[in-house]
């Protein structure tokens, strides 16, 4: 049976269970986590990604020099449209 190619997701979630047989020979069994573990891992990763996006966004805002109300409004609308477009495609 062919094993699917490793991806960062499978590498970060699966682990190898090493067992010893009675004759002392070791066998390795690849174990995949249960659904609860996968969801926990997914939520942790997504929280890290979301935090990174928020930090990057605030750095961009702080880098603006003397923004006018109109330029801020335009910038917010552009970011909102981009955010909504990405949300619909993912």
Swiss-Prot record:
Subcellular location: Host mitochondrion inner membrane; Host nucleus; Host cytoplasm, Host cytosol
Pfam families referenced in this protein's UniProt entry, alphabetically: PB1-F2
Region of interest (Disordered), ranges: 1-26
Membrane-crossing segments per the record: none
Family indicated by similarity: Belongs to the influenza viruses PB1-F2 family.
HAMAP family assigned: INFV_PB1F2
Protein name: Protein PB1-F2
Organism: Influenza A virus (strain A/Gull/Maryland/704/1977 H13N6)
Lineage: Viruses, Riboviria, Orthornavirae, Negarnaviricota, Polyploviricotina
């Amino acid at each position: 049976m062919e094993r699917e190619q490793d991806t960062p997701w499978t590498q970060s979630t699966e682990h190898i269970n090493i067992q010893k047989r009675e004759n002392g020979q070791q066998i390795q069994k690849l174990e995949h986590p249960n659904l609860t573990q996968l969801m926990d891992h997914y939520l942790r990763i997504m929280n890290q990604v979301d935090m990174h996006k928020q930090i990057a966004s605030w750095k961009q805002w702080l880098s603006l020099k003397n923004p006018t109300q109109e330029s801020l409004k335009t910038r917010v609308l552009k970011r909102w449209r981009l955010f909504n477009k990405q949300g619909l495609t993912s």
